[in-house]
């Protein structure tokens, strides 16, 4: 008897968690809704069952959120690239900047999502830290960038351009499709097929879901956070920070611009939830201000009590949130509207050589 009661209580608890998923009209219908006269009698029933479905299990939702954030924090160091001493290599820094500037231009050209660009940068950095870039093969970084962007688009986008169509926006080198495909397989093998890393956007999404019910600016908040992230992602100085630290610093900076009613409370909750090192966050925050000097000036000039001042700041800061490269600015004016071009001739299916043979083929020639 005790076992039956325990099982019944367990089932009732499971149904309570799912009660919020039922539609209201379903609560009144039962198998015997027709009375003796053939009329519906569910309207005469008590509305208590309807009322109970209007409340979500908030406690369970917060428990799920806590589990999610703990999982993100525990996994972020597993797929977080760290150059270490290699960051001092001027040749590597130069190649990375050129390659990632091209990635961001193609992102704008085709209208890819911000997550696609961030994934491409993550793949690029993780792969480049695992090999030694040869100075006599400057085209290698461009090939890795093309393959990384192609893989990221296949993971995130609904429509993906052909490999030859992907090489737009003044690509320095042009590679055949089979060469890019070989590099794709080499990247997949090197990264052990772990193509869903934890990124700053992972934390943006979590915070928006967490505070979205009591804050009406979540869409604008997300847009500005992603824009600021894209503007600094090619800067190697930000590679020393974990995604949670970078995300926290970005969100604090955006909160200061949007100025919600409980700005200080939001910032405190974010820092507590993400369990980040406050000193690292402050250091990253100052670096963000240094990267966006116009934002720092405007934050000192805008009157916090003036709604018009906040609006003027938003309009004037847009230019500093774009990708801060001369090549990006010059190419954006000449780039057409985001459009996926399709070629009629399909690329031939490549054969799958061994990893060793593939590596030799890739390194032999850029063509």
UniProtKB/Swiss-Prot annotation:
Expressed in developing vegetative and floral primordia. SUPFAM superfamilies: Cyclin-like. Coiled coil: none annotated. Disulfide bonds: none annotated. It comes from the Eukaryota. Keywords: Cell cycle, Cell division, Cyclin. GO terms for biological process: cell division; guard mother cell differentiation; regulation of leaf morphogenesis; seed development. InterPro entries: Cyclin (IPR039361), Cyclin-like_dom (IPR013763), Cyclin-like_sf (IPR036915), Cyclin_C-dom (IPR004367), Cyclin_N (IPR006671), Cyclins_cyclin-box (IPR048258). Residues 324-347 are annotated as: Disordered. PROSITE patterns: CYCLINS. Residues 324-335 have a biased composition (Low complexity). Interacts with CDKA-1. Promotes divisions in the guard cells (GCs) after the guard mother cells (GMC) symmetric division when in the presence of CDKA-1. Belongs to the cyclin family. Cyclin D subfamily. This is Cyclin-D3-2. It comes from Arabidopsis thaliana.
């Amino acid at each position: 008897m005790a076992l039956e009661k325990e099982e019944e209580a367990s089932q009732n608890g499971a149904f309570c968690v799912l009660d919020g998923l039922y539609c209201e009209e379903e609560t009144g219908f039962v198998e015997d809704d027709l009375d003796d006269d053939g009329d519906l009698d569910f309207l005469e029933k008590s509305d208590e069952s309807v009322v109970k479905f209007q409340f979500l299990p908030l406690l369970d939702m917060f428990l799920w959120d806590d589990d999610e954030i703990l999982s993100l924090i525990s996994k972020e160091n597993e797929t977080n690239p760290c150059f270490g001493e290699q960051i001092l290599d001027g040749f590597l820094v130069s190649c990375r900047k050129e390659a990632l500037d091209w990635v961001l231009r193609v992102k704008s050209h085709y209208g890819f999502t911000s997550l696609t660009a961030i994934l491409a940068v993550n793949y690029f950095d993780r792969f480049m830290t695992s090999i030694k870039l040869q100075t006599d093969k400057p085209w290698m970084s461009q090939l890795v960038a093309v393959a990384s962007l192609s893989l990221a688009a296949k993971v995130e986008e609904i429509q993906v351009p052909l490999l030859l169509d992907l090489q737009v926006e003044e690509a320095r080198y042009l590679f055949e499709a089979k060469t890019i495909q070989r590099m794709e397989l080499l990247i997949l093998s090197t990264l052990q097929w772990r193509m869903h890393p934890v990124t700053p956007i992972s934390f943006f999404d979590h915070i928006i879901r967490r505070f979205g019910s009591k804050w009406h600016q979540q869409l604008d908040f997300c847009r500005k956070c992603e824009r600021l992230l894209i503007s600094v992602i090619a800067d190697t100085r930000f590679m020393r920070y974990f995604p949670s630290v970078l995300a926290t610093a970005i969100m604090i900076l955006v909160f200061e611009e949007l100025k919600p009613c409980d700005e200080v409370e939001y910032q405190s909750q974010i820092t507590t939830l993400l369990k980040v090192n406050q000193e690292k966050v402050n250091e990253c925050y100052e670096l963000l201000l240094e990267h966006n000097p116009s934002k720092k000036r405007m934050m000192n000039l805008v009157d916090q009590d003036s709604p018009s001042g906040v609006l003027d700041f938003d309009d004037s800061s847009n230019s500093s949130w774009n990708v801060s490269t001369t090549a990006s600015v010059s190419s954006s004016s000449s780039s057409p509207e985001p459009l996926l071009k399709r070629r009629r001739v399909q690329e031939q299916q490549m054969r799958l050589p061994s990893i060793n043979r593939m590596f030799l083929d890739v390194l032999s020639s850029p063509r």
